[in-house]
Amino acid sequence: MKKSKRTDRKGSIHIQSTFNNTLITVSDAQGACVCWSSAGLVGFKGAKKGTPFAAGMAAEKVAQLAKDQGMKQVDVFVKGPGAGRETAIRALEAAGLQITSIQDVTGIPHNGCRPPKRRRV
C-alpha cells in the first residue's frame, strides 16, 4: 500500500543524539510520526554510528522523506550529548528544509541516577 502524501507544510523534527547513535524523527503538527531515520538505518554499524558524518547522512535521508511528504518548515528539538547534534541540523538546512526554531530539550537530572564511571584513556 502506497503512503498518501500529506498536505502539512509545517512539522517538527526530534534529534536524539547519544554517544552511540543518532535518531531523527519527523512528526506533523498533531504529533503523529511521519518518518524516521537513524545512523544504523542508513548503513553504519558499530562505533561508526556515533560519528557526526553518520548523523549527517541520517538527517539527509529524513529530510528527503519529509520533503516527499510535502513538508517545508520545521521546528527542531535536540536531545542528548552526542557528536551528531550540530551536523544533523546543518544537513537538514542544506537539504532544503526551512528551520523556524531550534530548541534543546536535553533532560537535566535533579540528582537522579548515578552517572557512568570516568573514562581512563
UniProtKB/Swiss-Prot annotation:
GO biological process, one term: translation
Record bears the keyword Signal: no
Gene Ontology molecular functions: rRNA binding; structural constituent of ribosome
Pfam families: Ribosomal_S11
Keyword rRNA-binding: yes
UniProt keywords, alphabetically: Chloroplast, Plastid, Ribonucleoprotein, Ribosomal protein, RNA-binding, rRNA-binding
Superkingdom per UniProt: Eukaryota
Subcellular location(s) of the protein: Plastid, Chloroplast
Similarity-based family: Belongs to the universal ribosomal protein uS11 family.
Subunit and partners: Part of the 30S ribosomal subunit.
PANTHER family the UniProt entry points to: 40S RIBOSOMAL PROTEIN S14/30S RIBOSOMAL PROTEIN S11 (PTHR11759)
Protein name: Small ribosomal subunit protein uS11c
Organism: Cyanidioschyzon merolae (strain NIES-3377 / 10D)
